């Protein structure tokens, strides 16, 4: 019983220690993430999540023989729509 309690306390202490020491100045990091997210909400053009680099733009060939990324729009009829 005592060993179980000691193990639980040790695990809790090590977990808390890991979270505290994982990111130096964690309050600044969280603040910067909040400001960046707020900026992206106000200006959706600034969001990198809306940009797809793994797809073909409209007008590019997308036939059956082509091996590569799919069309950004999802529509293909010999050329991306």
Swiss-Prot record:
The keyword Mitochondrion does not apply. GO terms for cellular component: extracellular region; host cell presynaptic membrane. Residues 1-22 form the signal peptide. Its main location: secreted. Residues 23-51 form a propeptide. Coiled coil: none annotated. It is found in: Secreted. Expressed by the venom duct. Disulfide bonds join 55-72, 62-76, 71-80. Keywords: Disulfide bond, Ion channel impairing toxin, Knottin, Neurotoxin, Presynaptic neurotoxin, Secreted, Signal, Toxin. It holds the Pfam family Conotoxin. GO terms for molecular function: ion channel inhibitor activity; toxin activity. The presence of a 'disulfide through disulfide knot' structurally defines this protein as a knottin. Belongs to the conotoxin O1 superfamily. Omega-conotoxins act at presynaptic membranes, they bind and block voltage-gated calcium channels. Act on high voltage-activated (HVA) calcium currents in molluscan neurons. This is Omega-conotoxin-like Vc6.4. It comes from Conus victoriae (Queen Victoria cone). The lineage of its organism: Eukaryota, Metazoa, Spiralia, Lophotrochozoa, Mollusca.
